[in-house]
Protein backbone atom coordinates (compact mmCIF):
# COMPACT_ATOMS: atom_id res chain seq x y z
CA UNK A 1 0.00 0.00 0.00
CA UNK A 2 1.38 3.41 -0.97
CA UNK A 3 2.05 6.00 1.74
CA UNK A 4 0.32 9.41 1.49
CA UNK A 5 3.64 11.06 0.72
CA UNK A 6 4.29 8.71 -2.23
CA UNK A 7 0.87 9.38 -3.75
CA UNK A 8 1.42 13.13 -3.37
CA UNK A 9 4.82 12.86 -5.07
CA UNK A 10 3.31 10.92 -8.03
CA UNK A 11 0.58 13.54 -8.37
CA UNK A 12 3.13 16.37 -8.33
CA UNK A 13 5.26 14.55 -10.93
CA UNK A 14 2.25 14.06 -13.20
CA UNK A 15 1.26 17.69 -12.80
CA UNK A 16 4.83 18.83 -13.44
CA UNK A 17 5.05 16.74 -16.64
CA UNK A 18 1.75 18.09 -17.85
CA UNK A 19 2.75 21.64 -17.04
CA UNK A 20 6.03 21.26 -18.94
CA UNK A 21 4.31 19.78 -21.98
CA UNK A 22 1.64 22.48 -21.98
CA UNK A 23 4.27 25.19 -21.67
CA UNK A 24 6.35 23.83 -24.59
CA UNK A 25 3.28 23.51 -26.80
CA UNK A 26 2.24 27.07 -26.04
CA UNK A 27 5.79 28.45 -26.32
CA UNK A 28 7.54 26.77 -29.28
CA UNK A 29 10.11 29.59 -29.38
CA UNK A 30 11.55 28.07 -26.17
CA UNK A 31 13.73 25.79 -28.29
CA UNK A 32 15.08 28.75 -30.25
CA UNK A 33 15.83 30.80 -27.14
CA UNK A 34 17.48 27.84 -25.43
CA UNK A 35 19.10 26.01 -28.34
CA UNK A 36 22.37 25.38 -26.47
CA UNK A 37 20.55 24.01 -23.43
CA UNK A 38 18.43 21.75 -25.63
CA UNK A 39 21.60 20.29 -27.17
CA UNK A 40 22.85 19.46 -23.69
CA UNK A 41 19.73 17.54 -22.66
CA UNK A 42 20.39 13.80 -22.36
CA UNK A 43 17.75 11.09 -22.83
CA UNK A 44 18.06 7.54 -21.36
CA UNK A 45 19.01 4.90 -23.96
CA UNK A 46 18.78 1.10 -23.39
CA UNK A 47 22.17 0.42 -25.02
CA UNK A 48 24.22 3.61 -24.98
CA UNK A 49 23.15 4.81 -21.55
CA UNK A 50 22.11 8.27 -22.68
CA UNK A 51 21.87 10.14 -25.98
CA UNK A 52 21.26 13.75 -26.81
CA UNK A 53 17.73 14.96 -27.37
CA UNK A 54 18.60 15.61 -31.01
CA UNK A 55 19.93 12.05 -31.48
CA UNK A 56 16.86 10.63 -29.75
CA UNK A 57 14.53 12.58 -32.02
CA UNK A 58 16.47 11.55 -35.15
CA UNK A 59 16.34 7.89 -34.09
CA UNK A 60 12.56 8.14 -33.66
CA UNK A 61 12.28 9.75 -37.08
CA UNK A 62 14.38 6.97 -38.67
CA UNK A 63 12.22 4.31 -37.01
CA UNK A 64 9.09 6.05 -38.24
CA UNK A 65 10.46 6.19 -41.78
CA UNK A 66 11.42 2.50 -41.57
CA UNK A 67 7.88 1.57 -40.50
CA UNK A 68 6.43 3.63 -43.36
CA UNK A 69 8.77 1.93 -45.85
CA UNK A 70 7.76 -1.52 -44.56
CA UNK A 71 4.07 -0.62 -44.81
CA UNK A 72 4.55 0.71 -48.34
CA UNK A 73 6.40 -2.46 -49.38
CA UNK A 74 3.57 -4.57 -47.95
CA UNK A 75 0.97 -2.52 -49.82
CA UNK A 76 2.94 -2.96 -53.05
CA UNK A 77 3.16 -6.72 -52.50
CA UNK A 78 -0.58 -6.91 -51.88
CA UNK A 79 -1.31 -4.81 -54.97
CA UNK A 80 0.87 -7.08 -57.13
CA UNK A 81 -0.78 -10.19 -55.65
CA UNK A 82 -4.27 -8.78 -56.21
CA UNK A 83 -3.39 -7.87 -59.79
CA UNK A 84 -2.18 -11.43 -60.37
CA UNK A 85 -5.39 -12.85 -58.91
CA UNK A 86 -7.47 -10.55 -61.09
CA UNK A 87 -5.80 -11.61 -64.33
CA UNK A 88 -5.93 -15.30 -63.42
CA UNK A 89 -9.63 -15.01 -62.70
CA UNK A 90 -10.26 -12.98 -65.86
CA UNK A 91 -8.44 -15.55 -68.00
CA UNK A 92 -10.43 -18.40 -66.43
CA UNK A 93 -13.75 -16.62 -66.91
CA UNK A 94 -13.05 -15.92 -70.57
CA UNK A 95 -11.96 -19.50 -71.16
CA UNK A 96 -15.02 -21.04 -69.49
CA UNK A 97 -17.39 -18.63 -71.22
CA UNK A 98 -16.02 -19.74 -74.59
CA UNK A 99 -16.78 -23.41 -73.88
CA UNK A 100 -19.03 -25.16 -76.41
CA UNK A 101 -20.46 -27.70 -73.96
CA UNK A 102 -20.42 -28.64 -70.30
CA UNK A 103 -17.75 -31.27 -70.92
CA UNK A 104 -15.66 -28.67 -72.75
CA UNK A 105 -16.09 -26.25 -69.84
CA UNK A 106 -15.05 -28.87 -67.29
CA UNK A 107 -12.02 -29.76 -69.40
CA UNK A 108 -11.02 -26.10 -69.68
CA UNK A 109 -11.39 -25.73 -65.92
CA UNK A 110 -9.23 -28.79 -65.31
CA UNK A 111 -6.60 -27.59 -67.80
CA UNK A 112 -6.47 -24.16 -66.14
CA UNK A 113 -5.68 -25.84 -62.82
CA UNK A 114 -3.01 -28.02 -64.43
CA UNK A 115 -1.37 -24.92 -65.90
CA UNK A 116 -1.02 -23.65 -62.32
CA UNK A 117 0.89 -26.79 -61.38
CA UNK A 118 -2.03 -28.55 -59.69
CA UNK A 119 -3.23 -32.11 -60.20
CA UNK A 120 -6.63 -30.89 -61.34
CA UNK A 121 -9.94 -29.21 -60.58
CA UNK A 122 -13.35 -30.80 -60.05
CA UNK A 123 -16.97 -29.85 -59.48
CA UNK A 124 -19.59 -31.74 -57.49
CA UNK A 125 -23.19 -30.53 -57.38
CA UNK A 126 -26.02 -31.17 -54.95
CA UNK A 127 -28.91 -32.83 -56.87
CA UNK A 128 -31.51 -30.99 -54.78
CA UNK A 129 -30.24 -27.74 -56.34
CA UNK A 130 -29.56 -28.90 -59.93
CA UNK A 131 -31.41 -31.13 -62.39
CA UNK A 132 -28.80 -33.85 -62.84
CA UNK A 133 -30.97 -36.92 -63.40
CA UNK A 134 -32.06 -38.61 -66.64
CA UNK A 135 -32.27 -37.77 -69.44
CA UNK A 136 -29.24 -35.53 -68.77
CA UNK A 137 -25.74 -37.00 -68.82
CA UNK A 138 -24.60 -35.01 -65.81
CA UNK A 139 -25.26 -37.59 -63.11
CA UNK A 140 -21.51 -38.05 -62.51
CA UNK A 141 -21.44 -34.55 -61.02
CA UNK A 142 -24.04 -35.37 -58.36
CA UNK A 143 -22.91 -35.29 -54.73
CA UNK A 144 -25.28 -36.58 -52.07
CA UNK A 145 -25.75 -33.85 -49.51
CA UNK A 146 -26.34 -36.51 -46.85
CA UNK A 147 -23.04 -38.22 -47.67
CA UNK A 148 -21.18 -34.91 -47.76
CA UNK A 149 -22.57 -33.53 -44.50
CA UNK A 150 -20.19 -35.36 -42.12
CA UNK A 151 -17.21 -34.18 -44.19
CA UNK A 152 -18.55 -30.63 -44.22
CA UNK A 153 -18.97 -30.59 -40.45
CA UNK A 154 -15.53 -32.10 -39.86
CA UNK A 155 -13.52 -30.02 -42.34
CA UNK A 156 -15.42 -26.81 -42.98
CA UNK A 157 -17.51 -26.29 -39.86
CA UNK A 158 -19.00 -22.82 -40.24
CA UNK A 159 -16.47 -21.82 -42.91
CA UNK A 160 -16.96 -21.78 -46.68
CA UNK A 161 -13.43 -22.92 -47.58
CA UNK A 162 -11.11 -25.71 -46.48
CA UNK A 163 -7.43 -26.11 -47.35
CA UNK A 164 -5.52 -29.20 -46.30
CA UNK A 165 -5.57 -33.00 -46.53
CA UNK A 166 -8.54 -35.34 -46.80
CA UNK A 167 -8.47 -38.91 -45.57
CA UNK A 168 -9.37 -41.94 -47.69
CA UNK A 169 -13.10 -42.14 -46.85
CA UNK A 170 -13.48 -38.40 -47.36
CA UNK A 171 -11.84 -38.57 -50.78
CA UNK A 172 -14.20 -41.37 -51.77
CA UNK A 173 -17.13 -39.04 -51.08
CA UNK A 174 -16.00 -36.04 -53.11
CA UNK A 175 -13.36 -37.45 -55.51
CA UNK A 176 -14.00 -41.19 -55.88
CA UNK A 177 -11.82 -41.53 -58.99
CA UNK A 178 -8.93 -39.31 -57.86
CA UNK A 179 -5.50 -40.81 -57.22
CA UNK A 180 -2.47 -39.60 -55.26
CA UNK A 181 -4.22 -36.60 -53.72
CA UNK A 182 -1.97 -34.97 -51.13
CA UNK A 183 -4.03 -31.91 -50.28
CA UNK A 184 -7.08 -30.03 -51.53
CA UNK A 185 -8.58 -26.57 -51.68
CA UNK A 186 -12.33 -26.99 -51.27
CA UNK A 187 -15.02 -24.33 -51.42
CA UNK A 188 -18.79 -24.35 -51.22
CA UNK A 189 -20.41 -23.08 -54.41
CA UNK A 190 -22.65 -20.03 -54.58
CA UNK A 191 -23.27 -16.97 -52.47
CA UNK A 192 -25.30 -19.09 -50.03
CA UNK A 193 -22.75 -21.94 -50.12
CA UNK A 194 -25.49 -24.50 -50.86
CA UNK A 195 -25.08 -25.45 -54.55
CA UNK A 196 -22.19 -27.90 -54.43
CA UNK A 197 -18.43 -28.01 -54.06
CA UNK A 198 -15.44 -26.96 -56.14
CA UNK A 199 -12.16 -28.75 -55.44
CA UNK A 200 -8.58 -28.15 -56.50
CA UNK A 201 -6.16 -31.00 -55.85
CA UNK A 202 -2.41 -31.25 -55.41
CA UNK A 203 -0.20 -34.30 -55.07
CA UNK A 204 1.86 -32.36 -52.54
CA UNK A 205 0.51 -32.92 -49.02
CA UNK A 206 1.80 -29.51 -47.91
CA UNK A 207 0.65 -27.51 -50.94
CA UNK A 208 -2.67 -26.50 -49.38
CA UNK A 209 -2.67 -25.60 -45.70
CA UNK A 210 -4.97 -23.83 -43.29
CA UNK A 211 -4.21 -20.13 -43.05
CA UNK A 212 -3.47 -19.62 -46.75
CA UNK A 213 -5.36 -16.98 -48.72
CA UNK A 214 -8.73 -17.95 -50.16
CA UNK A 215 -9.67 -14.87 -52.19
CA UNK A 216 -9.21 -16.51 -55.61
CA UNK A 217 -10.99 -19.65 -54.41
CA UNK A 218 -13.87 -17.54 -53.13
CA UNK A 219 -14.26 -15.64 -56.41
CA UNK A 220 -14.25 -18.86 -58.43
CA UNK A 221 -16.90 -20.40 -56.16
CA UNK A 222 -19.12 -17.38 -56.80
CA UNK A 223 -18.46 -17.29 -60.55
CA UNK A 224 -19.04 -20.95 -61.47
CA UNK A 225 -22.80 -21.35 -60.76
CA UNK A 226 -23.77 -18.74 -63.35
CA UNK A 227 -21.57 -20.43 -65.96
CA UNK A 228 -23.00 -23.84 -65.09
CA UNK A 229 -26.54 -22.60 -65.67
CA UNK A 230 -25.77 -22.48 -69.40
CA UNK A 231 -25.79 -26.27 -69.39
CA UNK A 232 -27.62 -27.40 -66.25
CA UNK A 233 -31.00 -26.21 -65.03
CA UNK A 234 -31.34 -25.10 -61.43
CA UNK A 235 -34.06 -26.60 -59.23
From Swiss-Prot:
Gene3D superfamilies: 3.30.450.40. This is Uncharacterized protein YigA. The gene is yigA.
Amino acid sequence: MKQPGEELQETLTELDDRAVVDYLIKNPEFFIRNARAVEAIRVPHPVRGTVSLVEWHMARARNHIHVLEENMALLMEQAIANEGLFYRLLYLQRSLTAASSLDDMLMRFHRWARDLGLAGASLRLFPDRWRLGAPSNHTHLALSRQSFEPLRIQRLGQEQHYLGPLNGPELLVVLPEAKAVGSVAMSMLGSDADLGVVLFTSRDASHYQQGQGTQLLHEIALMLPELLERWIERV
